[in-house]
């Protein structure tokens, strides 16, 4: 089975908003490979380290909010 990692990354980025705290900081509780790809795309800070959270970049926050609305919000 071929996996489209960009779609997975979009879902992970959107779901990171569920653990948002202290501004643009989010808990890093997702697959490490997906988190590394999001970092390589410039959407989050480096996930490697002891800290249990990462920071969404301005671009990452904007994209995460848009994806969350598109994927998970209902239309009135």
For each of these PLM feature ranges, what is it?
Residues 23, 46, 64:
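Short, electropositive, low-hydrophobicity segments enriched in small/polar residues
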Residues 41-49:
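A short, conserved structural fragment
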Residues 51-56:
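Minor-groove-contacting beta-hairpin "wing" of winged helix-turn-helix DNA-binding domains
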């Amino acid at each position: 089975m071929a996996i489209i990692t960009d779609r997975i990354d979009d879902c992970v980025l959107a779901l990171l908003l569920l653990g948002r705290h202290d501004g643009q900081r989010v808990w890093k509780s997702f697959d490490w490979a997906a988190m590394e790809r999001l970092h390589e795309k410039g959407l989050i800070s480096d996930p490697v380290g002891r800290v249990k959270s990462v920071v969404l970049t301005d671009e990452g926050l904007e994209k995460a909010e848009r994806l969350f609305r598109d994927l998970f919000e209902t239309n009135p």
